[in-house]
């Protein structure tokens, strides 16, 4: 069996594809698949490095350099070529290892403010260029802070930070990520948009912490060596995503809104940058599981 086919079997197995499905998709016997998997498992593998979210990353992210690179990429997207080469493959690999389990996650939701107005006033190509520039730069920033992009929903991005062993650092990284994203929009994206007569953009961010379930929703179809392969597609199901998404709608332009669970684990310096939000019960009525009162929200100034 060719080495490339063996690697394909291992990759599919590590993604959670059952051996029977691998054999059927590659048109080989189940015994051949089992042998490749067994041989791979016998080999000594180094331990997986800890998630970046378990380190304090604001100290190592060079924001000035990130802003400069964002300007360069946005300029290319608007004037030279429009490229989007980001992938959620790493996200799917992480989720495949957590399939059918409950996991503690920090959920970050960011979206463009006034996208409806933009879509009604801009030609399709200019709107697409803005959304693509925003999506790419925000995704790069999420990755830099140890997060994973879960999905793109129109002009919004859903991301998560693993928080099973420690809640403080993932929450801090998510909050600092949000702060950096706003700075990159203001100093990295908007100056280039202005330069070429595009409207400036604003964003809003919602962040919350909670338990979620990793589930498989169907299959992604790929072609490898001319053969059609089906790989499980994983997603996250949980109350936290609903709350974070709703929180984002309550944020002002360029504001970060966090939930009570995130606020409670922040240090005093970080807490001092947030203030309680006073919201009508008709607009916000989520009940906290542990206080049994209305789930409190906090926003930046």
Where are these predicted regions, by residue range?
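Intrinsically disordered, glycine/charged-rich C-terminal tails and inter-domain linkers
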Residues: 11, 17-21, 27, 31-87, ...
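Catalytic NTP-binding/metal-coordinating core of nucleotidyl cyclase/transferase enzymes
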Residues: 93-173
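Catalytic/regulatory signature loops of cyclic-dinucleotide turnover enzymes
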Residues: 232-261
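Short, amphipathic alpha-helical "recognition" segments used to contact nucleic acids or chromatin
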Residues: 1-17
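Extended, amphipathic alpha-helical stalk segments that mediate dimerization
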Residues: 230-231, 240, 276-280
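Short gly/ser/thr-rich secondary-structure transition/capping motifs
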Residues: 87-92, 188-189
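Catalytic core of nucleotidyl cyclases, primarily class III adenylyl/guanylyl cyclases
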Residues: 145-170, 189-236
